[in-house]
């Protein structure tokens, strides 16, 4: 298969498929849109706007859209309604096929592990729709970003660049963003593997304008308080925690539970 050719032409082909799809829309599509509306509506709008801005990051969009002003959002939903439908259709088809694959595996005794990174990209619908949950300044630019300090393998450390969570804000609403995230992941996968688990105990914060990770500082994370809050709402989840890197005594003491396992 010529994957490069497919990558370059996939959306043109999928847009042709969209015309046929909406000539006879299955009832399951509307049910999917209603069930997944809490994330699907924002995601589809976000992708439609990125397409309209030639792939530019949301932080570079015009101010009314960047700051999600109500009038601008309402106008965008109307202007890009057709493109929004396109992205919703893609998600419906993906989830339909994914569920078929997962069911096929489960029926044969195979469980699927899903890798979930602790951080999300700055140019993501998560940050665009929830800016108060991240360390951003008044212009919605990252104040501090994620990474790892210098070590024997890298004199400059690792500058990942992901915006950091406002754990204080997340604590105030009972970690609802994380609860929603893990709830969705638990439907996609049989087991969730959380990458960079030690970041929940303490995390490395690098000034947002820096070009290396040399000037970062360590800060305390929410610890197991986050997972206790999630468990109260979702019950026990089957989680694998990464044990790669230096694990603090606090992390080693608090992390084990009957359904937790470690996997590097």
Regions found by a protein language model. Give the residues of each.
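Conserved, well-ordered alpha-helix/loop/beta-strand core segments that scaffold catalytic motifs
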Residues: 87, 92-119
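Short, solvent-exposed loop/turn segments at secondary-structure junctions
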Residues: 51-53, 66, 117-121, 198-201, ...
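Active-site neighborhood of glycoside hydrolase catalytic domains
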Residues: 101-103, 179-193, 197-248
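Aromatic-lined carbohydrate-binding surfaces of glycoside hydrolases
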Residues: 116-134, 186, 198-200, 219
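Conserved small/polar residues in nucleotide/adenosyl-binding loops
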Residues: 253-260
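Extended, charge-enriched "interface" segments that sit outside catalytic cores
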Residues: 1-87
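Aromatic- and acidic-residue-enriched carbohydrate-binding clefts of CAZyme catalytic domains
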Residues: 1, 53-85, 128-168, 203-225
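Conserved active-site carboxylates
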Residues: 170-175
């Amino acid at each position: 298969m010529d994957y490069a050719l497919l990558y370059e032409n996939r959306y043109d082909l999928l847009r042709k498929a969209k015309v046929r799809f909406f000539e006879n829309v299955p009832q399951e599509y509307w049910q999917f849109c209603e069930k997944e509306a809490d994330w699907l509506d924002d995601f589809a709008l976000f992708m439609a706007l990125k397409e309209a801005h030639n792939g530019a990051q949301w932080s570079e969009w015009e101010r009314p859209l960047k700051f999600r002003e109500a009038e601008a959002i309402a106008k965008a939903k109307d202007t890009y309604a057709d493109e929004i439908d396109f992205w919703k259709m893609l998600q419906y088809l993906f989830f339909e096929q994914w569920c078929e694959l997962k069911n096929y595996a489960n029926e044969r005794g195979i469980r699927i592990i899903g890798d979930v990174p602790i951080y999300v990209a700055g140019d993501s619908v998560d940050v665009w729709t929830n800016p108060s949950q991240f360390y951003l300044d008044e212009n919605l630019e990252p104040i501090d970003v994620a990474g790892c300090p210098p070590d024997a393998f890298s004199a400059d450390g690792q500058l990942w660049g992901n915006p950091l969570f406002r754990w204080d804000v997340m604590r105030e609403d009972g970690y609802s963003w994380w609860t929603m995230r893990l709830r969705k992941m638990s439907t996609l996968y049989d087991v969730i593997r959380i990458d960079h688990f030690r970041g929940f105990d303490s995390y490395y914060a690098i000034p947002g304008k820096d070009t290396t990770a040399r000037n970062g500082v360590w800060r305390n994370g929410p610890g197991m308080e986050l997972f206790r809050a999630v468990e109260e709402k979702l019950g026990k989840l089957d989680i694998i925690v990464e044990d790669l890197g230096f694990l603090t005594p606090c992390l080693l003491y608090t992390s084990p539970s009957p359904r937790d396992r470690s996997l590097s």
